[in-house]
């Protein structure tokens, strides 16, 4: 592909019809995707001789080819644009980080004593789904509230089925003990019904009903029941006082965008059935100068068009307007089969909602930029400490975690001047090395990481930080030499004799270049932060791997118990601990387990 782009020749043949354009660089890499009412007019604006913002000019300088697709109308253009952005994620587009599917509160319907839980993903199980909520934290807050007020169980079914006495939740008055029959199905069903009323946003009607019940219980001289209902009403009133968005039963999303030279933030508040489900901050990637309206338009398009499973409210309240909002509404209606209203000029309570979202976006962006500056300052201090010409842009740190050689896991964490790059974090399950040999484990992890780098996978770090001192530093040198990786700064970190933070010894590139930094050095604080994050990431991976291995390793010794039976047994009893407590008769009642096999399992589990 030619690196010289003839804009005049291209524009001479460009159509004036609606469509989508794609800009590529000299290596055929997609740089940017856009849509236009008139392709010719929109593309001509990129190639004018003056007036371009610096970042936009940088994009134009890289253009080697432009491809266009004509569409029937603007709505089709917007839908195609969102599809291409989601598929290719071009670096110069405003990009919304790809999130997990939004969580729901799930109420099982097939159980005599239904369970409330957090649910993500496809809605395959029979039951009711409430939400979606903007974050798992918002769901946990609601579940915690429901557990306090109505004591509906949240334990796993396998755990519930195998209880012989009430658990701690019963002792602290967060559950009525349905697992051991301490509450009747009828009374429990009433608690479930009240929970559903709350989740549906009917908290006022629920409070009225509970008040009536409280008065009736008092008249019957059932003061214990009256006190229980009084406490439930008090919890509901506190929730209502905390939620300033009463005054309707509608479904509304309030979305506010803020853009500064340092970045952008979009704050979303979700209201369903007149009840606030929660809020969330988004920080879109903005590669070229964009007006706040453009950022908001891009966010709304990607948020509601690229994720069909997301709940669509009846109304959006926004803090800025854009001429393409009617096109967006049309595209959403076509893609989702439902229309929504976008409101900008609002009054009264709705104006307060709007301002609340703006304030939250401003504060979140301010905090993020302040933290970014803090981390960037530490990167500059590190460059000064290592006598580098400029601050590094990518720093990777490796660590090893195991329990006496069991379930060894290596971690790789990545930091840049903006903070941790968690999407680039990696874990490596170490296999085929002597138990407890940290050097061999590090050799394997580094070999796997940099072999993939040589194959074109991932980015080269500026600095490789290795926790473990001289020995691990030598191992890193060996791997880099074996793979012919050059131009990489090695930094080894060894804890002092007392292992106290601030007394670390550092090694630059080899063991002969040993030095220390003052305990109050920002550069040392950065090294400690990254090392501790690598340790955290390694140990959580190790614990998960060890737990999985320990859950199955004992059962692997039983002839006739394969992987499927092991999973079924653990699921039936709720874990290895409960399985170990089971008698032979209880084991024989599990699906697919004969009396003879139950005796064998019991013998293995109770052997010395």
Curated annotation (Swiss-Prot):
It comes from Pseudomonas aeruginosa (strain ATCC 15692 / DSM 22644 / CIP 104116 / JCM 14847 / LMG 12228 / 1C / PRS 101 / PAO1). GO terms for biological process: DNA damage response; nucleotide-excision repair; SOS response. Residues 16-94 form the GIY-YIG domain. The UvrABC repair system catalyzes the recognition and processing of DNA lesions. UvrC both incises the 5' and 3' sides of the lesion. The N-terminal half is responsible for the 3' incision and the C-terminal half is responsible for the 5' incision. It is found in: Cytoplasm. PROSITE patterns: GIY_YIG, UVR, UVRC. Interacts with UvrB in an incision complex. Belongs to the UvrC family. HAMAP family: UvrC (MF_00203). The keyword S-adenosyl-L-methionine does not apply. It holds the Pfam family UvrC_RNaseH. It comes from the Bacteria. Residues 204-239 form the UVR domain. Its main location: cytoplasm. InterPro entries: GIY-YIG_endonuc, GIY-YIG_endonuc_sf, GIY-YIG_UvrC_Cho, Hlx-hairpin-Hlx_DNA-bd_motif, RuvA_2-like, UVR_dom, UVR_dom_sf, UvrABC_protein_C. One of its GO terms (cellular component) is cytoplasm. Keywords: Cytoplasm, DNA damage, DNA excision, DNA repair, Excision nuclease, SOS response. This is UvrABC system protein C.
């Amino acid at each position: 592909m030619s690196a010289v782009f003839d804009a005049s020749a291209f524009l001479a043949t460009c159509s004036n019809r609606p469509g989508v354009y794609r800009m590529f660089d000299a290596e055929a890499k997609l740089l940017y995707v856009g849509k236009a009412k008139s392709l010719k007019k929109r593309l001509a604006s990129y190639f004018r001789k003056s007036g371009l913002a610096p970042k936009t000019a940088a994009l134009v300088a890289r253009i080697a080819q432009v491809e266009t697709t004509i569409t029937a109308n603007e709505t089709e253009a917007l839908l195609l644009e969102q599809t291409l952005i989601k598929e290719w994620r071009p670096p110069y587009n405003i990009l919304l980080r790809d999130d997990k599917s939004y969580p729901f509160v799930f109420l099982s319907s097939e159980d005599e004593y239904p369970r409330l839980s957090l649910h993500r993903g496809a809605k395959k199980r029979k039951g009711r789904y409430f939400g979606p909520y903007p974050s798992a934290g918002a769901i946990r807050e609601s579940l915690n509230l429901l557990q306090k007020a109505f004591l509906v169980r949240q334990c796993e079914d396998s755990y519930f089925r195998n209880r012989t006495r009430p658990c701690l939740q019963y002792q602290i008055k967060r559950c009525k003990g349905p697992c051991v029959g301490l509450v009747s199905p009828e009374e429990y069903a009433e608690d479930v019904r009240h929970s559903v009323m709350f989740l549906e946003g009917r908290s006022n009607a629920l409070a009225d009903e509970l008040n009536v019940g409280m008065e009736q219980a008092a008249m019957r001289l059932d003061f214990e029941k009256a006190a229980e209902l009084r406490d439930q009403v008090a919890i509901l009133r506190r929730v209502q006082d905390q939620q300033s968005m009463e005054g309707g039963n509608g479904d509304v999303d309030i979305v506010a965008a803020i853009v500064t030279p340092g970045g952008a933030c979009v704050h979303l508040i979700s209201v369903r059935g007149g009840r606030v489900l929660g809020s969330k901050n988004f920080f879109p990637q903005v590669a070229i100068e964009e007006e706040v309206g453009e950022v908001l338009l891009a966010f709304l398009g990607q948020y509601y068009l690229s994720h069909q499973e997301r709940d669509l409210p009846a109304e959006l309240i926004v803090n800025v307007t854009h001429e393409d909002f009617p096109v967006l509404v049309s595209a959403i209606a076509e893609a989702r089969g439902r229309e929504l209203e976008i409101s900008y000029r609002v009054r009264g309570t709705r104006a307060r909602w709007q301002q609340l979202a703006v304030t939250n976006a401003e504060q979140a962006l301010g905090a993020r930029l302040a933290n970014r500056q803090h981390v960037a300052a530490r990167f500059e201090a590190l460059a000064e400490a290592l006598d580098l010409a400029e601050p590094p842009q990518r720093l990777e740190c490796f660590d090893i975690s195991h329990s006496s050689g069991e379930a060894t896991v290596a971690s790789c964490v990545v930091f840049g001047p903006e903070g941790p790059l968690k999407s680039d974090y990696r874990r490596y399950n170490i296999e085929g090395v002597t138990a407890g040999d940290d050097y061999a484990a590090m050799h394997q992890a580094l070999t796997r990481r940099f072999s993939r780098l040589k194959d074109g996978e991932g980015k080269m770090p500026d600095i490789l930080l290795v926790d473990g001192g001289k020995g691990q530093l030598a191992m890193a040198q060996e791997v880099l030499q074996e793979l012919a990786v050059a131009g990489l700064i090695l930094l080894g970190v060894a804890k002092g004799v007392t292992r106290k933070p601030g007394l670390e010894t550092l090694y630059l590139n080899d063991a002969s270049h040993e030095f220390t930094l003052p305990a109050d050095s920002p550069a040392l604080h950065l090294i400690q932060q990254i090392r501790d994050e690598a340790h955290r990431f390694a140990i959580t991976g190790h614990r998960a791997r060890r737990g999985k291995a320990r859950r199955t390793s004992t059962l692997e010794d039983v002839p006739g118990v394969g992987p499927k039976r092991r999973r079924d047994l653990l699921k039936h009893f709720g874990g290895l601990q409960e399985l170990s407590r089971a008698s032979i008769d209880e084991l024989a009642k599990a699906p697919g387990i004969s009396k003879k096999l139950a005796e064998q399992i019991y013998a293995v589990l109770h052997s010395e």
